[in-house]
A protein has these predicted regions:
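Alpha-helical/coil-rich non-catalytic "connector" segments in signaling and regulatory proteins
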Residues: 1-85, 103-168
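Cyclic nucleotide signaling catalytic output domains
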Residues: 167-173, 180-193
Length: 193
């Protein structure tokens, strides 16, 4: 706001909310370059965090014996060796083909935002042609409710010809056993496809 714009109209705010992009109200005296620097730094940190988590999870799933590749990274994020974990495998099909590439990344981005805003103790990453979620210290009932809500959200973002397949592993105890939960969810998904 400033000498040319006295206030941001509700129609602008509604449009921005509908399209999922932010609207900032900034006093005229604040330099735009400083705001952009802060926003870019926050985005970069968020992307770096997502890459670290995805790498650590993929290492935990695929290279479980090489603990140095994932244990300390996940512990720094608050996921401890003695916690209980459940892996959820999400596959998106269009006709009979698994959705990949840009479309899968779009779905993961929307899902990650939804998780970040609504839940704690859930990690997400894309792997190959699927999305993987890791729930930490959720009871069976809590896990079921969360997965139902996540499934509903995924159905809302799915295109008309897309199907969402979700398989949930049994809960395992310990970060070093995460690969077992992953393998179980993977086998369940293979049976569904």
């Amino acid at each position: 706001t400033g000498p040319y714009i006295s206030e941001i109209g509700q129609d602008v705010i509604d449009f921005a909310n509908e399209k999922g992009f932010p609207v900032f109200e900034v006093p005229w005296k604040i330099r735009m370059a400083e705001i952009m620097r802060i926003i870019c730094f926050a985005i970069t940190k968020e992307q770096q965090n997502a890459i670290e988590i995805a790498t650590a999870l993929n290492n935990a799933f695929l290279c479980p014996s090489q603990e140095e590749l994932y244990v300390s990274a996940l512990m720094r994020k608050g996921y401890f060796t003695d916690s209980a974990y459940t892996v959820v495998n999400v596959r998106v099909l269009e006709d009979t083909n698994r959705v990949t590439g840009t479309r899968l990344e779009q779905i993961l981005s929307k899902l990650s935002s939804h998780i970040r805003c609504n839940y704690n103790g859930i990690l997400s990453c894309a792997q190959d042609k699927q999305i993987l979620l890791v729930l930490c210290d959720y009871s069976d009932e809590s896990c079921r409710k969360v997965i139902e809500r996540i499934y509903q959200m995924l159905c809302r973002v799915a295109h008309q010809k897309e199907q969402i397949l979700v398989s949930v592993s049994k809960q395992i105890s310990g970060l070093r056993q995460l690969y077992k939960s992953y393998q179980f969810a993977e086998k369940m998904s293979d049976l569904l496809c």
